[in-house]
């Protein structure tokens, strides 16, 4: 039997599958939600501290919502992240929402 390295951050947590736009799946990663949020906040000219505070709250809310699901689409994550971000900063939410159309 091979020894498996256990990641203490994910040990005991339910793995959630994300269905991407081209129908492949990957595991949910809260760091990606945080990173996307942070990028939008910084482009909306928020300070590092403001961006960190907002994105910490947003990523926790999104993760809490996702933990209730077995699988979600990336589009659902996009919508919930936009809604949560809009609660804190309309400009950052707009940038997050429209960046997807550009990329």
Identify the residue ranges that each predicted region occupies:
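Long, C-terminal-biased catalytic regions of enzyme "large/alpha" subunits
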Residues: 1-103
